[in-house]
Amino acid sequence: MERTPFTIATGCGELSGWVSGAGPRVLAIHGGPGMNFGYLDDAVAELGAHYQVATFQQRGLAPSTEQGEFTIAEAVADIAAVLDGLGWDTAYLMGHSWGGHLVFHAAVGIPERLAGVLSVDPLGAVGDGGAAAFGAEMLARVPEASRDRARALDEKDTAGEATPEEAHEAFSLVWGSYFAHPPAAPPMPHVEFSQPANLGLWTDVTTRLPELEASLASITVPFGVLVGELSPMPPSAGVESAERIPGAWSHIEPGAGHFVWHEAPGCLLAAMDRLVADA
């Protein structure tokens, strides 16, 4: 799949990414927060069968700026800036995991720029978003011999005290937990982390959850939620969020984990096709 790179100026630094494919326009938002965007390549490739898809590295890591306030408002403004830079008046928005949470905020904040929104296995927008259940399940799926180490590293990371090496080790210990069948997980991709982006955005996520939950009923753009039946993120996190949005729908993909396109190839494209057809 041929990629055309782009770099877009914002009020604070530049954002870099690439675009490929042909068809209705989709902007893909990666997870994290504070994580590199390369893991999303296979998802973008699946969507590229029917769509022109752009994706970009969120601020905090190269090749985008490493500087920022690392707030929800800034992240939503960055989505609008990328759309501006691409010359896209409107586009469909697809977000995964943390990105799947961010797209709820985008649907509230910049609805005039969005043709529709697909949230994929997200941190939800009701209650704590499923965060506590997700964290517990991630640790429960780690082999017992490594569980105490994984827990200790997670606590350091949450406190903002983990070194880059410890953050990488922590992710490697829980990598299998993202999948429906952890022993069969694929090799871990190359990962990078921005601690300032992670800490700043998680703090703002937690602070703004009540406000976001209260705003769900005001969302007017076409909205779909796709979740994995066997994801460590409880499917209810996404499903209950969709139930609060007028006209929204949700789909639980049987046998899929957090990276739904890996264990159920084609389900992401089918969900986007449904969103576009409904819109």
Regions found by a protein language model. Give the residues of each.
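Conserved hydrolase catalytic core segment
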Residues: 89-133
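Active-site loop/oxyanion-hole signature of alpha/beta-hydrolase fold enzymes
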Residues: 55-94, 98, 270
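The conserved beta1-alpha1 loop
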Residues: 27-31, 96, 227
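Conserved serine/cysteine hydrolase catalytic core
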Residues: 184-240
